[in-house]
Amino acid sequence: MVEKRSRQSSSSGSEFSVPPDVDNPPLSIPLKTLSDRYQLIEKLGAGSFGCVTLAKAQFPLSNILGKQHDIRGTLMDQPKNGHQNYITKTQGVVAIKTMMTKLHTLQDYTRVREIKFILAIPANDHLIQIFEVFIDSENYQLHIVMECMEQNLYQMMKHRRRRVFSIPSLKSILSQILAGLKHIHEHNFFHRDLKPENILITPSTQYFEKEYMNQIGYQDNYVIKLADFGLARHVENKNPYTAYVSTRWYRSPEILLRSGYYSKPLDIWAFGCVAVEVTVFRALFPGANEIDQIWKILEVLGTPIKRSDFVNTNHITAPPPGGFWDDASNLVHKLNLKLPYVEGSSLDHLLSSSQLSDLSEVVKKCLRWDPNERATAQELCEMPFFENTVASQVDARGNVTNTEQALIFAGINPVATNTKPIYFNSSTKLPAETESNDIDISNNDHDSHAMCSPTLNQEKLTLVEFLNEFVEEDNDDHSIPDVGTDSTISDSIDETELSKEIRNNLALCQLPDEEVLDHSLSNIRQLTNDIEIINKDEADNMEQLFFDLEIPEKDEFQRKQPFNEHADIDEDIVLPYVNNSNYTHTDRSHHRGDNVLGDASLGDSFNSMPDFTPRNFLIPTLKKSREKFEPHLSNSNQHFGNVTF
């Protein structure tokens, strides 16, 4: 019989079990003492995975950059990046992401999705730099140490208000996002949560030494990095697919309509949504819930079902702006819904300026109903808008079409003879997710911005849910570098729906609450002034279409803090294609997290629907009573989920 050991945490005083394999930690995730290596300055945010803390390294960061023998070919292998983020590296400033849940064994941490991604993806200039990954030897929590960026893209846009990006800056920002996304896709992963909050930005003058910038001739005003790889998935992973990945506003039709399979095209859809939002400082599809999300897409892209399928139409017209999707009719029928006929609006109306005609073509290639019709990241890089940008200069390898990705998923080698398109079809839907609620790790409330399961209707994040969201099974078909990271634990837990982000719960983080009194760190604290802690309030008006471009006054959403002049490199530009007076992203968290799609009856799901949803959107047999949508502000609940590294 194995003796069960326990010890007392020095930070919280509580007892916890010592992992049975404490004497045999994974080679890729060693045991180290957090308090010996880093001084914790302040907590920046928290989410379902854990919390992010600003910290100062108590050793030169150059000691670990690219010098660890077991990290070659991973996101930690960055020996040539000494000039990047020079100021914060010199000061030893880092961001530490701490996993909130403790797993049974140390080897189990190698199954965490973000760890698998870090160990499988080579470093790239447009992905957040990872310094080290380790397990704290005092309380056995997982820590991911990464570079600290100034703010995320949403915060930058909100600070700028009416000052939209100039065309060169816009092109630079989007090309860097696309370059990072292309790098992920080339290595057969897809991000699954691309949104402005997960795109980090720092002015280039604060990121590089001036001498180095002049030496390499760096012209871009900003440095852009993709972050938060907790939902990243390998294309050959055949475990059941989660229905609630991605953030609702950037969620693709195949996810909204429960197609049963998705891959890289969902990132392309999200990129198209982000591209429009970064251009006009207004979310493209700000749905209040999933039904409203589908309706907002219909208003712009039109109905993807051929008009001959509708009773009162008997003449054929041109395809809708978003194209046709043969699977759509079957998918909505299985959800007990029906789509009204909507012609849609030309995508050219979204970006009407002649200066943005090339970008408009990019968006059209991204926002297609049928995932197989969307461009690949490589194809987007080759479009005129990205000519002579970093997106067009990256390595051209890994140019695989979406059809070939589906063939790979089906276990078929994509050779030249396989020319028949493989479609996303709900008839191949994978088995329903396993339901398990045995172990409850905390009494955490959920954020208001994500969907909860209609069948479980839980208010707690269980350990099983956490493992399903962030920890993969061991039977993945893709390989991870052989650095002793394979877990010896095997289970049959299927991947279930993505739970809502829990509120900031510092007790679960179990990080030492150390006060750093060193006055030399005042410049470090200054770095956090630009990282805005955003109130997760509910939006007060969601009834306007994006392309009306008349944004109601929402002063109550604006933070009472000075504008960050250092984050604004461009001149005060107000371009003719935008006339908004304030950028109010109306974050997804400002809305009620009503889940109105799924296996359960939809009858009671529309109680919080706005009045403008058309009546014929619902099958007549369903319950039609709906309460009027009464948005309200909630100042009592402050969340920190938008601060992402």
Swiss-Prot record:
<keyword id="KW-0547">Nucleotide-binding</keyword>
<keyword id="KW-0418">Kinase</keyword>
<keyword id="KW-0067">ATP-binding</keyword>
<comment type="function">
    <text>Protein kinase which is essential for the initiation of meiosis and sporulation.</text>
</comment>
<dbReference type="GO" id="GO:0030435">
    <property type="term" value="P:sporulation resulting in formation of a cellular spore"/>
</dbReference>
<dbReference type="GO" id="GO:0004674">
    <property type="term" value="F:protein serine/threonine kinase activity"/>
</dbReference>
<dbReference type="GO" id="GO:0035556">
    <property type="term" value="P:intracellular signal transduction"/>
</dbReference>
<keyword id="KW-0749">Sporulation</keyword>
<dbReference type="InterPro" id="IPR011009">
    <property type="entry name" value="Kinase-like_dom_sf"/>
</dbReference>
<keyword id="KW-0469">Meiosis</keyword>
<dbReference type="GO" id="GO:0005634">
    <property type="term" value="C:nucleus"/>
</dbReference>
<dbReference type="GO" id="GO:0005524">
    <property type="term" value="F:ATP binding"/>
</dbReference>
<comment type="similarity">
    <text>Belongs to the protein kinase superfamily. Ser/Thr protein kinase family.</text>
</comment>
<feature type="binding site">
    <location>
        <position position="67"/>
    </location>
    <ligand>
        <name>ATP</name>
    </ligand>
</feature>
<feature type="compositionally biased region" description="Low complexity">
    <location>
        <begin position="8"/>
        <end position="17"/>
    </location>
</feature>
<feature type="binding site">
    <location>
        <begin position="44"/>
        <end position="52"/>
    </location>
    <ligand>
        <name>ATP</name>
    </ligand>
</feature>
<feature type="active site" description="Proton acceptor">
    <location>
        <position position="193"/>
    </location>
</feature>
<dbReference type="GO" id="GO:0004672">
    <property type="term" value="F:protein kinase activity"/>
</dbReference>
<feature type="region of interest" description="Disordered">
    <location>
        <begin position="1"/>
        <end position="24"/>
    </location>
</feature>
<dbReference type="InterPro" id="IPR008271">
    <property type="entry name" value="Ser/Thr_kinase_AS"/>
</dbReference>
<dbReference type="GO" id="GO:0005737">
    <property type="term" value="C:cytoplasm"/>
</dbReference>
<dbReference type="GO" id="GO:0040020">
    <property type="term" value="P:regulation of meiotic nuclear division"/>
</dbReference>
<protein>
    <recommendedName>
        <fullName>Meiosis induction protein kinase IME2/SME1</fullName>
        <ecNumber>2.7.11.1</ecNumber>
    </recommendedName>
</protein>
<keyword id="KW-0723">Serine/threonine-protein kinase</keyword>
<dbReference type="InterPro" id="IPR050117">
    <property type="entry name" value="MAP_kinase"/>
</dbReference>
<dbReference type="GO" id="GO:0051321">
    <property type="term" value="P:meiotic cell cycle"/>
</dbReference>
<feature type="domain" description="Protein kinase">
    <location>
        <begin position="38"/>
        <end position="386"/>
    </location>
</feature>
<dbReference type="InterPro" id="IPR000719">
    <property type="entry name" value="Prot_kinase_dom"/>
</dbReference>
<dbReference type="Pfam" id="PF00069">
    <property type="entry name" value="Pkinase"/>
</dbReference>
<dbReference type="GO" id="GO:0106310">
    <property type="term" value="F:protein serine kinase activity"/>
</dbReference>
<keyword id="KW-0808">Transferase</keyword>
